[in-house]
A protein has these predicted regions:
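ABC ATPase nucleotide-binding domain
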Residues: 15, 35, 71, 352, ...
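A short, flexible loop at the N-terminus of ABC-type nucleotide-binding domains that lies
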Residues: 2-31, 35-38, 61, 80-84, ...
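Conserved ABC transporter NBD signature motif
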Residues: 68-79
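The feature captures the beta-strand-to-loop junction immediately N-terminal to the Walker
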Residues: 45-47
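ABC nucleotide-binding domain signature
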Residues: 43, 60, 83-85, 89-99, ...
Length: 376
């Protein structure tokens, strides 16, 4: 497992401390702290408007924070007394819209940082550096092409080459794949991983796409309303989300409320509108150990439908009515109603269900997670 900057002894490439930014009377960032380690990919993941891009712009030097410190490598680039311009910061940046100049060729776009940024590349070496980075992103043959002739994927690679040409130790990426179609996004995720491993560059990646963040990142920082509400490795955040917001935002989960009661035999049982079950049999419990309200989660993929269900000891069985259904890529999504409650089910079966069908469902209590309700 790769060490991270927020573990003891790890080398840090980026440190953000107490970062604040106001727009008018409102805080966009009320005080943000995090680190990115050397050769680490960290994703800032959150909904639109949560402050992700503002953080990136402050690090790049195109936005001035109201308070806080930013350290890139060993260089203090932002503080109460210091504010270095973008060209004096050892960072590369890829914008969401790529910012490829339409009146320039690919070469002229990519060479720009060498002409204007703070680096040690002699003028006579510019062309070699550009050709090397174009080869790296696999568009060397487009070197003299006008930017207006480029496809979306080629523009993205041009912007990536421009961000890498001066060999930065830190690369900032702001929703770089959001304008590409699904096939290109998948290919570029692979390309970004390849480049990261070849160049040993640290990467701070902003996205609202959970799939991108979890595929690429060593660590993910979950943001909401200008704050980092949770941080951790992708598997940890997916399997054991600690904050109420993360549980709602990450992955797909059925969510239903219940009440914990103690039986005469001393067992703690959860009563819900969907199904009742013993608390000791579930996958994960985070409550105060007493009776009271709880919130329960089960993933759509963990619920089996119809004859494809697997009954047996301890399996929870229930019947409901199909209220919505449809094919979503590689699986069917079926919404099943139980009076005032419902469950969303994902099945790979070729069977299609019609609205109004009565169908049985099965799932194991080991697939349920239970959390205390007050913070939900």
């Amino acid at each position: 497992m790769k060490p991270t900057a927020e573990t003891a002894g790890a080398e840090t490439e980026l440190a953000v401390r107490g970062l604040e930014k106001r727009f008018g009377d409102e805080f966009d960032l009320p005080g943000v702290d995090f680190e990115v380690g050397a050769d680490e990919i960290v994703a800032l993941l959150g909904p639109s408007g949560c402050g992700k891009t503002t953080i990136l712009r402050c690090i790049a030097g195109v936005e001035t924070p109201d308070a806080g410190e930013i350290v890139v490598g060993d260089d203090l680039v932002q503080s109460a007394d210091t504010s270095k311009p973008p060209e004096k910061r050892d960072v590369g940046m890829v914008y969401q819209n790529y910012a490829v100049w339409p009146h320039k060729t690919v070469y002229e776009n990519v060479v720009f940082p060498l002409k204007h940024a703070d680096h040690d590349v002699p003028r006579g070496e510019y062309e070699r550096h550009v050709e090397e980075v174009l080869e790296l992103v696999e568009i060397r043959e487009l070197k003299n092409s006008p930017a207006t002739d480029l496809s979306g994927g080629q523009q993205q690679r041009t912007a990536l080459a421009r961000s890498l040409v001066h060999d930065p130790d830190l690369l900032l990426m702001d929703e770089p794949l959001s304008n590409l179609d699904r096939g290109l996004r998948k290919n570029m995720r692979y390309e970004l991983q390849r480049l990261h491993h070849e160049l040993d560059v640290s990467l701070l990646y902003v996205t609202h796409d959970q799939e991108e963040a979890f595929y690429l990142a060593d660590r993910v920082l979950i943001m909401n309303d200008g704050e980092i509400v949770e941080r951790g490795r992708p598997r940890q955040l997916y399997d054991r989300p600690a904050s109420p917001f993360t549980r709602r935002f990450v992955g797909e989960r059925n969510r239903f409320r219940g009440t914990v009661e103690e039986t005469p035999d001393g067992d703690r049982v959860v009563r819900t509108p969907v199904v009742d079950f013993r608390l000791e049999t579930v996958d994960y419990v985070d409550d105060d150990g007493g009776d009271g309200d709880v919130v329960c989660f089960v993933r759509p993929a963990d619920v089996s439908v119809g004859r494809f269900g697997h009954g047996g000891p301890g399996v929870l069985e229930l019947d409901g009515t199909v209220v919505a259904e449809g094919l979503l890529g590689e699986h069917y999504e079926v919404t099943v109603s139980f009076g005032d409650a419902s469950l969303v089910v994902h099945t790979k079966s070729g069977r299609e269900f019609d609205r109004g069908d009565e169908i049985p469902l099965y799932f194991r209590p080991e697939d349920i997670q239970v959390y205390g309700a007050p913070d939900e």
